[in-house]
UniProtKB/Swiss-Prot annotation:
Phycourobilin binds at residues 50, 54, 61, 147-148. Heterododecamer of 6 alpha and 6 beta chains. The basic functional unit of phycobiliproteins is a ring-shaped hexamer formed from two back-to-back trimers contacting via the alpha chain subunits. The trimers are composed of alpha/beta subunit heterodimers arranged around a three-fold axis of symmetry. The phycoerythrins also contain a gamma subunit which is located in the center of the hexamer. (2R,3E)-phycoerythrobilin 1 binds at residues 72, 77-78, 82, 84-85. Contains two covalently linked phycoerythrobilin chromophores and one covalently linked phycourobilin chromophore. The gene is cpeB. It is a peripheral membrane protein. The light-harvesting antenna system in red algae and cyanobacteria is formed of phycobilisomes. These are composed of the phycobiliproteins phycoerythrin (CPE), phycocyanin (CPC) and allophycocyanin (APC). Cyanobacteria also contain phycoerythrocyanin (PCC). The phycobiliproteins all share the same subunit composition and organization with variations in the covalently bound open-chain tetrapyrrole chromophores. One of its GO terms (cellular component) is phycobilisome. This is R-phycoerythrin beta chain. It comes from Griffithsia monilis (Red alga). Pfam families: Phycobilisome (PF00502).
Length: 177
């Protein structure tokens, strides 16, 4: 996983060049948006349990067979595993958002996830749906539009961060499908 600074250094080093020009400008923008990025990650991690439990509840409401005998969320052990997986996915999305780089998702979360779910008989459509619900909830926190929950936000538009976070959730969802 490379953060924005490491990426610039590695790229410049590969070219045997000093860091400068557009690379410095991109780092300057990254720093200027740093407080918004930190706030966005804080909103997600502060509400992680709510985001994950709402996503799993929504997934179950849309597919009640998941909690029927034989369903993948039937028994406390399976429900706990489902919630745990949601927490892990959300945690890695927050890491990616903090770093401004999705490689942590590829390296530590998504590599083999679909194959594992298939081997365990986990319905990938339901898992993907839970991820899309997490996406909607998390991005609402980032833009401070989550119903019933308003927080003090850093000044400025957070649409770019919302789109970035959404792209990470989309990456997770498409890797499961």
């Amino acid at each position: 996983m490379l953060d924005a600074f490491s990426r610039v250094v590695v790229t410049s080093d590969a070219k045997a060049a000093y860091v400068g020009g557009s690379d410095l400008q991109s780092l300057k923008s990254f720093i200027n948006d740093g407080n918004k990025r930190l706030d966005a990650v804080n909103y997600i991690v502060s509400n992680a349990s709510c985001i994950v439990s709402d996503a799993v509840s929504g997934m179950i409401c849309e597919n009640p067979g998941l909690i029927a005998p034989g369903g993948n969320c039937y028994t406390n052990r399976r429900m706990a595993a489902c919630l745990r997986d949601g927490e892990i996915i959300l945690r890695y999305v927050s890491y990616a958002l903090l770093a401004g780089d999705s490689s942590v998702l590829d390296d530590r979360c998504l590599n083999g996830l679909k194959e594992t779910y298939i081997a365990l008989g986990v319905p990938t459509a339901s898992s993907s749906r839970a991820v899309s619900i997490m996406k909607a909830t998390a991005t609402a926190f980032i833009t401070n539009t989550a119903s019933g929950r308003k927080v003090e936000v850093a000044a400025g538009d957070c649409q770019a961060l919302q789109a970035e976070a959404a792209s990470y959730f989309d990456k997770v969802g498409s890797s499961i499908d």
